[in-house]
Amino acid sequence: MTKNKNNQPIWSSRIKKNSNNLFRKVGGSLDIDKRLFNEDISASIVHTEMLFKQKIINFKIKNKIVWGLNRIRNEIIKKKFPFDKNLEDIHMNIEKRLFDLIGEDAGFIHTARSRNDQVITDFKIWLKKSTYEINKTLDALISTILKVADKNIKTVMPGFTHLKNAQPISFAHYMMAYVEMFKRDKKRFKNNLDALNENPLGVAALSGTSFNIDRNFTTKKLNFSKPTDNSIDTVSDRDFVLDFLYACSACSIHISRIAEEFIIWNSDAYNLIHLNDKIVTGSSIMPQKKNPDPLEYLRGKTGSSFGNLFSMLTILKGLPLSYFKDLQDDKELVFKSYDQLKISLSLLNDICLLYTSDAADDIR
């Protein structure tokens, strides 16, 4: 049983001196991973139920832990939770609060569980949910582009090669090319669900546990498809992070390409489309200007998505098995790419919606 008192980290039993303040600052991740609170609490409740099912803890302890975790969830939702950055991360904050609420029985929550399998379980649950959210946003964008295409089957525009006029084409045909791109993006995100659906819970630090746990129980309760097969690989694996970040980057490329085309078509040199006043800005000194800033924003943000992917690739390059502190950055990189992609897809959808009513009039 792990004891957590006096705001000390749970790993402090052998460490007699407090950590260097600067290391505490750079080593903590609370500001980043506190968005995992719901996944952490849900996984901890299921883990506790499994411990009771396997007769590792009794009914009274199980109920106390579950009650405490549900109360903590409500405190966080209502913004009444006492976050403490000295406790490193969201997992330790929740555990310390559980000790405050129910006493030393809170220590049973770490029976047959390490932070290694705890964190990666939370992360996979969050990524599964977020993958579905991204694909819902992609569905909305695809639907909008389909409406644009449907209204512009007979709208003729030049097709280009080398940015030179090549052949006359339908504006609908052109926009449908982007539908195909975004459909492929959906497939990329969906394909990663196979890896995300493998349950890490139960592998503990790296080699499992001597407790008689039931990984199939937690797999079913947490909506995974199967337990992971190798405990060392489970703790070390971040392929699912790379796949998610690559999917974000590929999708960002497609967003950047359509943004670039709209910018070019709107330029004085091409003058193929005009942009609604809702998606342009003016100039502080040149009153005639209408600048496509939102589209330029979409184009520019692609670089940060690439950067997050390359950062994760670099972290994993040459990293031995199994867990290292290097891997702590995985969540920050994923959260940044996810947040940016959601905003970009929604903004592009809003821009495309302006074409649904009178797109034919926008093509000159």
Kindly label every feature range from the protein language model:
Residues 55, 341, 356:
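Metal-dependent nucleic-acid phosphoesterase active-site entry motif
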Residues 355-364:
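Single conserved hydrophobic/aromatic residue that forms the stacking wall/gate
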Residues 15, 344-350:
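Short, charge-rich, low-complexity alpha-helical interaction segments
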Residues 2-208, 213-219, 226, 281-283, ...:
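A helix-coil-helix interface module used to build multimeric assemblies
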Residues 127, 135, 150, 158, ...:
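Charged, flexible cofactor/metal-binding loops and thiol motifs
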